[in-house]
Amino acid sequence: DILAAFRVTPQPGVPPEEAGAAVAAESSTGTWTTVWTDGLTSLDRYKGRCYHIEXVPGEEDQFIAYVAYPLDLFEEGSVTNMLTSIVGNVFGFKALRALRLEDLRIPPAYVKTFQGPPHGIQVERDKLNKYGRPLLRCTIKPKLGLSAKNYGRAVYECLRGGLDFTKDDENVNSQPFMRWRDRFLFCAEAIFKSQAETGEIKGHYLNATAGTCEEMYKRAIFARELGVPIVMHDYLTGGFTANTSLAHYCRDNGLLLHIHXXMHAVIDRQKNHGMHFRVLAKALRMSGGDHIYAGTVVGKLEGERDITLGFVDLLRDDFVEKDRSRGIYFTQDWVSLPGVLAVASGGIHVXHMPALTEIFGDDSVLQFGGGTLGHPWGNAPGAVANRVALEACVQARNEGRDLAVEGNEIIREASKWSPELAAACEVWKEIRFNFKAVDTL
């Protein structure tokens, strides 16, 4: 069975048992009345069952309802069908004040019907020939308004300075000021020029998201013909069907696939209604993507440490044990499905590098947008500062130093021989985003 954990807030006067049963019925075989065609099938075989209800500590009117769904309710290899069944209709139920899907347990038999990520962590490292450290990346800013040539210039400067990747922002598609084909051409030129000068493999996440699947394929095919290593997709606004199709194309044609989670906070930000990001992360791993955003813990975007590391493990590891302290409601076995690199992004700069290296480990992508392009000396020095800070942190960690305790000292030591890093430390030394996370256990 597929198991689901729902946070249920019933209307006043509705018992939690009734609310849990209603969720199970509405998201499987039930409707609001008895129908004569019920007698033409075996409802016992197909109906969802609410098998356990528990109170939420500190919340008098909220309960966790556990629901089991028989596997035969779901089409094989279709995230679209799975989510349509489980969360498609029930969230508007009048008997509930609010409903949130906290977690899913996907059984190995169903996991095996999915291709998953086009390549996975190890294949990506082999393609890029980069091992033993997180990857570095920058989103080109301003995200909108640059011409294709100026955009390509910024890409070149960042890659030449030492970053592994640069990236289109999520809303860069094909606007009047910069059509997609022009952007692809100038970015490809920047990639190959920086590769020739540095001797390292470089990439730029070319956003293939489009208004139709046919147009999306056209852009992905052009990227492959240019010989670039990676494309990108906005998987929630683009849709799971389009995302799975693009993931299959990327595996067949040797392209890495970066996933942007634009719109996720609309779904997952509210604590008592919607869907937790760990569910979206599991769905993405099944649908297909080699990278996805996972918060930062230390930056400007939402993310509490234990919860964030919980779904980072769900993205990367083959087997994840149930751990309620990290928000993981079920043990998850991914069998042979490849892992996904977690991307840390949002309001981070060189002073955060020790914490990010310690929190996310090697199998991650650290994304410094303003933290690269905001350097007072320009884009390339900003990239140099980030690369020097990362190399210093990785070396210190490998020497057995504690990044959590000695992080500031490690960055200070490195800045003595890197004027670019020293300038970055000076300009961002006062920047803090000290807000409490909304999403807590």
Swiss-Prot record:
Gene encoding the protein: rbcL
UniProt xrefs under SUPFAM superfamilies: RuBisCo, C-terminal domain (SSF51649), RuBisCO, large subunit, small (N-terminal) domain (SSF54966)
Gene3D superfamilies: Ribulose bisphosphate carboxylase, large subunit, C-terminal domain (3.20.20.110), RuBisCO large subunit, N-terminal domain (3.30.70.150)
Maturation and modification: The disulfide bond which can form in the large chain dimeric partners within the hexadecamer appears to be associated with oxidative stress and protein turnover.
Species of the source: Asclepias exaltata
Active-site feature positions: K141 (proton acceptor), H260 (proton acceptor)
The keyword Oxidoreductase is annotated on this UniProt entry: yes
Lineage: Eukaryota, Viridiplantae, Streptophyta, Embryophyta, Tracheophyta
Protein's name according to its UniProt entry: Ribulose bisphosphate carboxylase large chain
Residues involved in Mg(2+) binding: K167, D169, E170
Gene Ontology BP annotations: photorespiration; reductive pentose-phosphate cycle
